[in-house]
Each structure stands twice: as C-alpha cells, then as structure tokens.
Amino acid sequence: MDSTKSTEETAINIPRESSSTKHKIAVAAVKAVATPHKRGGMKRGVAIFDFILRICALAAALAATATMGTTDQTLPFFTQFFQFQASYDDLPTFTFFVIANAIASGYLVLSLPFSIVAIVRPHVTGVKLLLLILDTVLVAFTTAAAASAAAIVYLAHNGNSNTNWFAICQQFNDFCQRTSGAVVASFIAAAIFIFLVVLSAVALRRH
C-alpha cells in the first residue's frame, strides 16, 4: 500500500502541447522566414525603380547635349562685311553646358551595370553607397550647367537695358528655341539626379 502511494506521489504529469500552441509556433516560424524575403523584395523593387530613373535621366541628358551641341543658325541676310550667325560655341557658358551634360550622360551609361548589380543582389550596400556619392556630385554638376545656361537664355530672350544687351531671339528664333529646350531637358536630368540621391539615401537608411 505504501509503495503504491509513493509511486503515485513521485509521478510527474507532463502537460501535452495543445494544438493552438503548435499553431502559434508554426505561424511565428513562417513570419520569421517571410520577413527577410519581404525586405529583399522591397529593396529589389527600389533598385528596379532606380534603374528606370537612370534611363530617364540618360535620355534627358543626351537630349540636352545633342540639342545644344547642334544649335547653329545663320540669318538669310548679310552685308559685305558681316554675316549674322549664332552658334552655341560662341558662348563659353553653352560650351560648358554641352560638356557637363555629355559627362552626365557618360556617367549614367556606366552606372547602369552597377544598378543591375543592385537589382540582382539587393542587400549589397557598397554599390548603393558608391552610386549615392557619384549621384550627389552629378547633381551639382548638372544643376550648375543648367542654371548658367538658363541665365544666358534669359538674356537672349529679354536682354538687359542697363548694360545695353539687346534681346536676339526676335532675329535668331530657332537658336533660342533650341537652347531653351536644351536647358529644360538639363533641368529634368538634374531633378531626376536629386530624386536618385533621395531614393538611395532612403534605401541605405532602411538597410
């Protein structure tokens, strides 16, 4: 009798796991596995958007370079000593504009493979940091070129009576239209560069 009581007293009741507990553990495991995949998918989506923006910026920079670099107009009338002609290389500001946008176009072409690497390997931060630094440099470069050219285009359209600079766009209409279009395209490229910098900074911050 005593042995029976001692056996009952020393028996340990091990509670069985309920089905709800097993379900919670399974859900937690699934969430732990799904979270990295979700973050990776989000980063890949940001990298794809970055690639698309670079193509758009490349198109804008190339348009600005080609338009300004081929701007040349000669008026149909001339005198014995003068021929009225306007070309982009008559002004150093426009020459700098063409060079700056050509450099921006070349950089964008070279940055596309790095952007593809960021798509394939979205967790790599070195490539994103490099692009962020170079994009910031190109923001300043393209903005300076576009702003300086915009000042010259404004003078071509309106002149400046205080300095006796006359507006020439009434005579050189095609010249002014092409230079104005090139400046607009360059500002678009600069705006896309700014957006790329913000996008890269946000992506690195979330990493």
UniProtKB/Swiss-Prot annotation:
Cross-referenced NCBIfam families: A_tha_TIGR01569 (TIGR01569)
Entry's transmembrane regions: 46-66, 96-116, 129-149, 182-202
Chief localization: membrane
Localization annotation: Cell membrane
Membrane side Extracellular: residue ranges: 67-95, 150-181
Protein's name according to its UniProt entry: Casparian strip membrane protein 3
Function, in words: Regulates membrane-cell wall junctions and localized cell wall deposition. Required for establishment of the Casparian strip membrane domain (CSD) and the subsequent formation of Casparian strips, a cell wall modification of the root endodermis that determines an apoplastic barrier between the intraorganismal apoplasm and the extraorganismal apoplasm and prevents lateral diffusion.
UniProt organism field: Erythranthe guttata
Gene Ontology BP terms: cell wall organization
Keyword Ribosomal protein part of the UniProt annotation: no
GO cellular-component term (any): plasma membrane
UniProt xrefs under Pfam families: CASP_dom
Domain of life: Eukaryota
